[in-house]
From Swiss-Prot:
<comment type="subunit">
    <text>The LHC complex consists of chlorophyll a-b binding proteins.</text>
</comment>
<keyword id="KW-0597">Phosphoprotein</keyword>
<feature type="binding site" description="axial binding residue">
    <location>
        <position position="216"/>
    </location>
    <ligand>
        <name>chlorophyll a 4</name>
    </ligand>
</feature>
<keyword id="KW-0603">Photosystem I</keyword>
<feature type="binding site" description="axial binding residue">
    <location>
        <position position="230"/>
    </location>
    <ligand>
        <name>chlorophyll a 5</name>
    </ligand>
</feature>
<feature type="binding site" description="axial binding residue">
    <location>
        <position position="245"/>
    </location>
    <ligand>
        <name>chlorophyll a 6</name>
    </ligand>
</feature>
<dbReference type="InterPro" id="IPR001344">
    <property type="entry name" value="Chloro_AB-bd_pln"/>
</dbReference>
<dbReference type="GO" id="GO:0009535">
    <property type="term" value="C:chloroplast thylakoid membrane"/>
</dbReference>
<feature type="binding site" description="axial binding residue">
    <location>
        <position position="96"/>
    </location>
    <ligand>
        <name>chlorophyll a 1</name>
    </ligand>
</feature>
<dbReference type="GO" id="GO:0016168">
    <property type="term" value="F:chlorophyll binding"/>
</dbReference>
<feature type="binding site">
    <location>
        <position position="261"/>
    </location>
    <ligand>
        <name>chlorophyll b 5</name>
    </ligand>
</feature>
<comment type="similarity">
    <text>Belongs to the light-harvesting chlorophyll a/b-binding (LHC) protein family.</text>
</comment>
<dbReference type="GO" id="GO:0046872">
    <property type="term" value="F:metal ion binding"/>
</dbReference>
<feature type="binding site">
    <location>
        <position position="101"/>
    </location>
    <ligand>
        <name>chlorophyll b 2</name>
    </ligand>
</feature>
<feature type="binding site">
    <location>
        <position position="212"/>
    </location>
    <ligand>
        <name>chlorophyll a 5</name>
    </ligand>
</feature>
<dbReference type="GO" id="GO:0009416">
    <property type="term" value="P:response to light stimulus"/>
</dbReference>
<keyword id="KW-1133">Transmembrane helix</keyword>
Length: 265
């Protein structure tokens, strides 16, 4: 555990210690801990380079040569050799980052309407994510946030058209850049349009944020898969499933549903 500095700044006494079978500094948190701001900055040595954390800890001595810790989220695991080819590696890395971002947005969108309706009393008519779309065929149609004074979503073609145009513009800017802004970057375009707060201005912070993004993106993709399975098995939203489980864990859990679930029944 990182030790707290007694003053606003201090220096770390560095010594080699075993960390998951690898030689690491005694404190993996860089000692830039300020008492006033209580800010901890992770050492990027923990996530990048040959001495980074591996997926099996001390049993990860033999990792593929092409997984050298250059990119965020590289724990040395590719048993199927899917990324042995450099072009395939670049493609898979881009797919993972983009799908992770979509999954983070999707997971929030699946939960947030249920939260707003239950505790903020916002009337969505149907807050459950996989049932909401069907409301477009109801008598009252479907309105954004359940408010008829906002954009009316009754026309599926109009919504689809706007979605294609808006997403096409954003993706085009992301890949090709903007006039006068630069050539762009497929995964991390940055700049005033994609990073207006300047969160990635510092290279060390930027490298750390990439790791946080890919880790949370992977977790969100698993979460979305869980939401899909819950929807098929229970017919309920994620928040309702969680509350049911907390209310009666014995009667509401995966094992109970696994014993009585029959696909298509």
């Amino acid at each position: 555990m990182a030790s707290m500095a007694a003053t606003a700044s201090s220096t770390t006494v560095v010594k080699a210690t075993p960390f998951l079978g690898q030689t690491k500094n005694a404190n993996p948190l860089r000692d830039v801990v300020a008492m006033g701001s209580a800010r901890f900055t992770m050492s990027n040595d923990l996530w990048y380079g040959p001495d980074r954390v591996k997926y099996l800890g001390p049993f990860s001595a033999q990792t593929p040569s092409y997984l050298n810790g250059e990119f965020p989220g590289d724990y040395g695991w590719d048993t199927a050799g899917l990324s042995a080819d450099p072009e395939a590696f670049a493609k898979n890395r881009a797919l993972e980052v983009i799908h992770g971002r979509w999954a983070m947005l999707g997971a929030l969108g699946c939960i947030f309407p249920e939260v707003l309706e239950k505790w903020v009393k916002v009337d969505f008519k149907e807050p459950v994510w996989f049932k909401a779309g069907s409301q477009i065929f109801s008598d009252g149609g479907l309105d954004y946030l359940g408010n008829p004074n906002l954009v009316h979503a009754q026309s599926i073609l109009a919504v689809l058209g706007f979605q294609v145009v808006l997403m096409g513009l954003v993706e085009g800017f992301r890949i090709n850049g903007l006039p006068g802004v630069g050539e762009g970057n497929d995964l991390y375009p940055g700049g005033q349009y994609f990073d207006p707060l300047g969160l990635a201005d510092d290279p060390t912070t930027f490298a750390e944020l990439k790791v946080k993004e890919i880790k949370n993106g992977r977790l969100a993709m698993f979460s979305m898969f869980g939401f899909f399975v819950q929807a098929i098995v229970t017919g309920k939203g994620p928040l309702e499933n969680l509350l049911d489980h907390l209310d009666n864990p014995v009667a509401n859990n995966a094992w109970v549903y696994a014993t009585k679930f029959v696909p298509g029944a």
